Curated annotation (Swiss-Prot):
Pfam families: Chorion_2. It is found in: Secreted. This is Chorion protein S18. Chorion membrane (egg shell) protein; plays a role in protecting the egg from the environment. Keywords: Secreted, Signal. Belongs to the chorion protein S15/S18 family. Its main location: secreted. GO terms for cellular component: egg chorion; extracellular region. The keyword Secreted applies. Residues 1-17 form the signal peptide. Residues 146-159 have a biased composition (Low complexity). One of its GO terms (biological process) is chorion-containing eggshell formation.
């Protein structure tokens, strides 16, 4: 439904635009509403030779002046976005133009370059009442089994057998 309404409104706008006597290529109107979507170009805006406001719907669009355009400063052309003689002000494009004027030889686009920071979380002082070890639980278990194995090997070499003390040699 929304798509149909959008197509319907666009068709009415195209028919009414041609009804005002503007020239166009085929059925597509040229001129008139083009300034409403024209972005602000760096520091200067390209304007038709007759300007936007002279005559009916732009003096530069009639009289076969399609190829001619002049450059005027943005401040001289962009007055208010609500007035009929002005294009909407693209603040982002103007600020980018000011940045490019401030650093003309930058080359690469301006990117915020900062090394990555590793954030270490700190949860405050930790209180522990147990004995602190410098090794983990798995290493502690391996150390205990290695100590038991070494003691059993030492017992075998000194005359003890694996079965215990009942077969002792004294």
């Amino acid at each position: 439904m929304m798509k149909f309404m959008c197509i319907f409104v666009c068709a009415i706008a195209a028919v009414s635009a041609n009804a005002y006597g503007r020239q166009g290529y085929g059925s597509v109107p040229v001129g008139g509403y083009a300034y409403q979507v024209q972005p602000a170009l760096t520091v200067k805006a390209i304007v038709p030779a007759g300007g936007y406001g002279g005559g009916s719907y732009g003096g530069g669009y009639g009289n076969n002046n399609y190829g001619r355009s002049i450059e005027v400063p943005v401040s001289a052309h962009y007055t208010s976005s609500r007035g009929y003689g002005a294009a909407p002000v693209d603040r982002q494009a103007i600020s980018l133009a000011k940045l490019s004027l401030a650093a003309p030889n930058a080359g690469a686009p301006l990117v915020w370059k900062e090394p990555r920071q590793i954030v270490e979380r700190s949860y405050g002082p930790q209180q522990s009442y147990g004995q602190k070890h410098s090794y983990g639980y798995g290493e502690q278990a391996q150390g205990a089994s290695a100590a038991a194995a070494s003691s059993s090997v030492a017992g075998q070499h000194s005359g003890y057998k694996n079965s215990g003390y009942k077969n002792s040699s004294y």
